[in-house]
């Protein structure tokens, strides 16, 4: 928590020396007598942190803050204040002057942060003030930047003085609303709006300049249009003459060509006939040769057709059938593989079932073995062991009778028994070890491929997990980007929607205002009669010439006089005839649009009168009708309007002729012939003027129309952007949903893969551990096996030797009882050994059952994996079978085609002989015709030589004419759709030359012609097109700037409304706690808050609802304090200072205020200057302040 830890004052106001005042977090009260300087502590805070001016610290000038009893060297004085803050752990502040680009590279400082301000005053009254941060010089701007990082704001309410409460009470509602403006940052939006409006003004200026240029270009185009039209006509006529001259050359050439063509036609006909004969001869020769060749082929074909081609087609057919058989074989193999796989799957499933049955049988056998077999074998071993002990006791009793023999026999028997007892376990152990060794080797051989398989699968899963992790990170990044883009897009869309709604409301309001103004204007026009004329002009009635005011132009110096003289007659409608006037009257009746006066040109008669000769009179200008510039056809109209009205310069000069004539002055004074005079001051005229339409809109109407037009443009652009944002938002939402679905799928795959990796890792670890254990066991077993194999042979030799000695002893001297007992002992021992061996075999069998059970489980798992592999292979084979079916169908079609070809060849062989005989007959006929045509060709060659000599002469003449022919030849309309072979080109040429002479005369008549007008018009038109495109671009920029202004306006309103709602909510809560009543903030204009002010409305307990202005002094203070607390809660700071804000409150309200401060002190440090007991008692600590000997302020004590 940041808080003020210490304030050190040196010669500041009432503090004469250097005084350090420590503070702690929480609620501290500074108290002391009036005038003791307790409020100077808060002034010191304001001074040091630069939060107030000198007047805010109750001083006229800064030098007044220096203690007047302190003088330094050379008569100068100095005051300083240092404020030390305790920073929260991890709180960072940038160094003064460091870059504030938000890169987080600000220097970390210690937990204490000290601000010092020194004020030096020279002897002459000049002063300087310097700020220091941790001993380093800083500017006030740098200080405020770092204070902002600590949430201490110069414009905030960190320190509330007595005047602040009074100021809130006395300020008007608009100033009170501006407090919320400042909190909401409205000024920043205002600056942006002003800057954008400046840019908009520049764009509008550019648009106006371009519009002026465009208007000038349009006028230039209109001026060039006539010259361009004349130049185009001249150019077209000149092109026609030149074109006809080309036609004449062509027609002259065609006349000679016509003669040549006739001769050439005869020659060509002979040539064609000769060529036809020659071609016929060549064709017949070729036909003879062809038929001769074909005949030879048929002869050869008859011989060879039955063998070669038929064999080739048959071979092709055999190849195709072989390919079909191969495809069929592959298809059958695929079916067999699928069938085999299905059989194998069935076998594997049967094996799985069998293995499961075996597994169940083994489990049952294990259970039976554990519960019945082993307990029975253990009981039998115990019984045999007991019988053996009894027999041995009997043998010892018999042995006492024959001591020596028995001792020797006993010794040998004991030796044999000892050796047997030693050998039998070792032999059994050897067998067990050998069997166990085989089991271990088998287990190790099974574990190695299983470990390899698990390792490979584990690597695949780990690789897949890496892929899933990478995919998940990529998807997470993409989702974050999309979510950020979508959130930004939604903010933009919300802003656009809010702007659109606000503009719609404004549009409706502006339209209502415009409708009211237009209705009022229409009522005024109806009174003046101009509304009826507007209806007629807008009805597009044929024959309406316009208003009198529109039909003439007047110089500006005479305009006022003539408009006064004409009066309301300027609004009369001029029409072609009385029929048009009648139609106009009928329209007015139907529309109920009022009345109008029509002046039909065919009926109007000007008043008759004498032309007064007053040119001699002083100030005389002219007759009013002579000062109008207009079409002569409207002369009677203007004569009817003005009559004999005379224009004078001034009223003084006009008065000399009063009562004689109707006179108007340049200043607008009107003197009637009857002697009546009218005049006076001139108001802003809104009626008709010469050269204008019916009436002009007022500035307010123009402003409303322009605003509505701007709103419409902005709405159009806003709707486009809103639609774009909506479409883009839907796209991003869809993409985000798809990405999240992909992320969920990847996450599920990843989690499954993690479980598989954990399972495989555990399985790998278990297999490795099993391998290590098995290898250790195998090593130990092999070591024990080696020891046994070394120790068994000597023992077996000893046993054989002892058994031989015992046999010899027993055969040498037989003792019936001893032998009998020994036989019984050996029988019982053999039975004992057999039962003991059976017990050990039962235990080994149990171990075998356990191993078999484990192997069966592994076998079942492997079989299930094989089933999955076969099913995957069957799916691949089924796809290949479909492809083979398609290939077989295509091959069968090819085989059918080949078989049909082979059948046709077989049929053709029979008809070949008949074709050969027919060709021999045709060949003889062709040779006879060839001889007859040869004689005709020789005759035509003689005629062609005569024609060729005549053509040479005509060709020379054509070559001379060809030099002047145009290239390429033009199309001649005179010759189109006509047969040139039957035309008389001489008559056509004469008529064409006559037309050329007429065209040349017309060209001479049109000269001179400005041919440059064509290029100038095109250049001007191109420039106007470029300028139009530029105007469209500027209009787009203007719309974008308008939309930006509206968006800033929306954000400005939104920011204010958010701040207002939050402060209002805080005010309601705090006021309820302070006064046991209810209160709220009220805007004068909720629809447009910036158009009004802010009122504090309170309802103290037991009193009616009142505004701030109608409350008592205490209620005002309590309400103002509630407002200040609400502002502080909206923008919290680490510390606050109050200077006797409770002085106008009674005891009960002071107690409530102190509770509120104590509650707020849980979140921030409060330093309160107060003399009231409830405030002092509520504080966590109290600092006492007094005047030391009536001179300097002194801190007497600190109550902690």
From Swiss-Prot:
GO terms for molecular function: ATP binding; ATP hydrolysis activity; DNA binding. It is found in: Cytoplasm. Residues 542-656 form the SMC hinge domain. Residues 90-109 are annotated as: Disordered. Gene3D superfamilies: 1.10.287.1490, 1.20.1060.20, 3.30.70.1620, P-loop containing nucleotide triphosphate hydrolases (3.40.50.300). The keyword Acyltransferase does not apply. One of its GO terms (cellular component) is cytoplasm. The keyword ATP-binding applies. One of its GO terms (biological process) is DNA replication. Keywords: ATP-binding, Coiled coil, Cytoplasm, DNA-binding, Nucleotide-binding. ATP binds at residues 33-40. InterPro entries: P-loop_NTPase, RecF/RecN/SMC_N, SMC, SMC_hinge, SMC_hinge_sf, SMC_prok. Residues 202-528, 692-1046 form a coiled coil. It holds the Pfam family SMC_hinge. It comes from the Bacteria. Required for chromosome condensation and partitioning. Contains large globular domains required for ATP hydrolysis at each terminus and a third globular domain forming a flexible SMC hinge near the middle of the molecule. These domains are separated by coiled-coil structures. HAMAP family: Smc_prok. Belongs to the SMC family. Homodimer. This is Chromosome partition protein Smc. It comes from Synechocystis sp. (strain ATCC 27184 / PCC 6803 / Kazusa).
């Amino acid at each position: 928590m940041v808080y003020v830890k210490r304030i050190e004052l040196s010669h500041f106001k009432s503090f004469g020396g250097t005084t350090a005042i420590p503070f702690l977090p929480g609620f501290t009260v500074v108290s002391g007598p009036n005038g003791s300087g307790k409020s100077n502590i808060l002034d010191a805070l304001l001074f040091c942190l630069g939060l107030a001016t000198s007047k805010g610290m109750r001083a006229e000038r800064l030098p007044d803050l220096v203690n007047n009893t302190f003088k330094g060297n050379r008569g100068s004085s100095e005051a300083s204040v240092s404020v030390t803050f305790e920073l929260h752990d991890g709180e960072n502040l940038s160094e003064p002057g460091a870059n504030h680009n938000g890169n987080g590279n600000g220097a970390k400082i210690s937990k204490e942060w000290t601000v010092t301000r020194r004020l030096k005053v020279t002897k002459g009254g000049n002063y300087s003030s310097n700020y220091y941060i941790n001993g380093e010089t800083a500017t006030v701007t740098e200080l405020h930047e770092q204070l902002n990082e600590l949430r201490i704001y110069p414009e905030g309410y960190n320190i509330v003085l007595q005047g602040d409460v009074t100021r809130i009470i006395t300020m008007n509602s608009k100033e009170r609303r501006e407090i919320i403006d400042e909190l909401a940052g409205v000024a920043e939006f205002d600056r942006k709006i002003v800057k954008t409006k400046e840019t908009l003004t520049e764009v509008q200026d550019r648009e106006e300049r371009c519009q002026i240029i465009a208007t000038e270009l349009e006028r230039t185009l209109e001026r060039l249009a006539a010259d361009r039209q004349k130049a185009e006509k001249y150019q077209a006529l000149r092109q026609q003459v030149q074109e006809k001259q080309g036609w004449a050359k062509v027609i002259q050439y065609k006349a000679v060509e016509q003669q040549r063509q006739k001769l050439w036609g005869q020659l060509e006909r002979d040539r064609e006939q000769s060529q036809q004969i020659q071609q016929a001869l060549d064709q017949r020769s070729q036909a003879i040769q062809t038929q001769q060749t074909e005949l030879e082929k048929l002869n050869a074909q008859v011989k060879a057709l039955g063998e070669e081609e038929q064999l080739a087609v048959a071979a092709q057919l055999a190849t195709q059938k072989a390919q079909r058989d191969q495809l069929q074989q592959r298809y059958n193999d695929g079916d067999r593989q699928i069938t085999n796989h299905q059989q194998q799957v069935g076998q594997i499933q049967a094996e799985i079932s069998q293995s499961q049955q075996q597994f169940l049988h083994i489990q049952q056998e294990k259970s039976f073995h554990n519960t019945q077999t082993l307990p029975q074998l253990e009981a039998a071993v115990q019984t045999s062991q007991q019988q053996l002990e009894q027999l041995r006791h009997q043998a010892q009793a018999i042995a006492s009778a024959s001591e020596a023999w028995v001792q020797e026999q006993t010794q040998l028997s004991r030796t044999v028994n000892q050796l047997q007892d030693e050998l039998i376990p070792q032999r059994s152990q050897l067998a067990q070890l050998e069997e166990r060794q085989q089991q271990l080797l088998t287990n190790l051989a099974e574990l190695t491929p299983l470990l390899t398989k698990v390792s490979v699968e584990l690597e695949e899963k780990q690789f897949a997990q890496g892929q899933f992790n990478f995919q998940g990170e990529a998807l997470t990044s993409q989702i974050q980007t999309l979510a950020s883009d979508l959130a930004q897009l939604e903010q933009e869309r919300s802003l656009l929607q809010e702007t659109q709604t606000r503009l719609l409301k404004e549009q409706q309001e502006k339209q209502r205002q415009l409708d009211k103004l237009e209705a009022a204007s229409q009522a005024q026009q109806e009174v003046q009669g101009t509304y009826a004329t507007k209806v007629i002009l807008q009805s597009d009635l044929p024959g309406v010439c316009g208003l009198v005011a529109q039909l003439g132009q007047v110089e500006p110096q005479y305009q006022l006089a003539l408009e006064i003289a004409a009066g309301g007659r300027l609004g009369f409608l001029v029409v072609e005839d009385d029929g048009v006037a009648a139609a106009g009257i009928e329209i007015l009746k139907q529309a109920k649009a009022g009345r109008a006066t029509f002046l039909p040109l065919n009926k109007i008669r000007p008043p008759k009168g004498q032309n007064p000769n007053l040119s001699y009179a002083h100030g005389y200008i002219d007759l009013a009708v002579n000062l109008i510039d207009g079409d002569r056809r409207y002369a009677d109209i203007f004569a009817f309007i003005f009559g004999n009205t005379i224009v004078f310069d001034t009223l003084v000069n006009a008065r000399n002729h009063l009562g004689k004539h109707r006179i108007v002055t340049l200043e607008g004074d009107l003197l009637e012939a009857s002697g009546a005079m009218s005049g006076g001051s001139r108001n802003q005229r809104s009626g008709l003027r010469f050269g204008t339409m019916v009436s002009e809109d007022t500035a307010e109407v123009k402003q409303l129309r322009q605003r509505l037009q701007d709103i419409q443009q902005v709405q159009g652009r806003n709707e486009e952007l809103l639609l774009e944002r909506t479409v883009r938002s839907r796209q991003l939402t869809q993409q985000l949903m798809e990405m999240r679905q992909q992320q969920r799928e990847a996450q599920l795959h990843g989690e499954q893969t993690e479980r598989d990796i954990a399972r495989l890792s555990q399985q790998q670890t278990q297999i490795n551990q099993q391998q290590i254990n098995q290898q250790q066991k195998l090593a130990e077993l092999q070591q024990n096996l080696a020891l046994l194999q070394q120790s068994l042979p000597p023992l077996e030799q000893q046993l054989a030797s002892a058994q031989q000695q015992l046999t010899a002893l027993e055969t040498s001297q037989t003792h019936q009882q001893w032998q009998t007992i020994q036989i019984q002992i050996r029988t019982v021992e053999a039975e004992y050994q057999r039962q003991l061996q059976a017990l050990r075999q039962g235990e080994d069998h149990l171990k075998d059952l356990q191993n078999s059970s484990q192997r069966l489980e592994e076998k079942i798992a492997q079989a299930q994996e094989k089933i999955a592999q076969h099913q995957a292979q069957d799916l691949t084979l089924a796809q290949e079978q479909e492809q083979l079916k398609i290939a077989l169908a295509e091959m069968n079609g090819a085989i059918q085609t080949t078989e049909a070809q082979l059948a046709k060849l077989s049929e053709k062989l029979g008809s070949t002989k008949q074709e050969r005989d027919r060709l021999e007959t045709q060949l003889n006929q062709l040779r006879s015709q060839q001889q007859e045509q040869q004689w005709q060709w020789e005759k035509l060659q003689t005629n062609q030589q005569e024609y060729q000599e005549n053509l040479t002469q005509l060709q020379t003449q054509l070559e001379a004419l060809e030099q002047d022919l145009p290239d390429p030849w033009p199309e001649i309309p005179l010759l189109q759709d006509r047969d040139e072979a039957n035309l008389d080109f001489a008559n056509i040429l004469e008529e064409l030359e006559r037309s050329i002479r007429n065209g040349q005369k017309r060209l001479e008549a049109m000269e001179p012609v400005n041919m440059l007008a064509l290029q100038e018009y095109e250049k001007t038109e191109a420039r106007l097109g470029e300028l139009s495109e530029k105007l469209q671009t500027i209009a787009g920029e203007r719309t974008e700037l308008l939309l930006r202004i509206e968006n800033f306006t929306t954000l400005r309103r939104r920011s204010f409304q958010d701040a207002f709602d939050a402060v209002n909510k805080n005010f309601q809560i705090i006021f309820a706690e302070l006064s046991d009543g209810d209160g709220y903030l009220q805007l004068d204009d909720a629809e447009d808050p910036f158009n009004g002010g802010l009122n504090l409305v309170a309802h103290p307990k037991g009193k009616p609802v009142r505004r701030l202005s109608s409350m008592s002094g205490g209620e005002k203070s309590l309400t103002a304090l509630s407002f200040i607390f609400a502002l502080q809660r909206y923008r919290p700071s680490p510390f606050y200072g109050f200077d006797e804000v409770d002085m106008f409150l009674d005891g009960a309200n002071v107690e409530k205020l102190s509770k509120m401060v104590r509650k707020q002190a849980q979140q921030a440090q409060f330093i309160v200057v107060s003399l009231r007991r409830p405030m002092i008692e509520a504080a966590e600590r109290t600092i006492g302040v007094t005047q030391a000997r009536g001179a300097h302020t002194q801190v007497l004590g600190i109550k902690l």
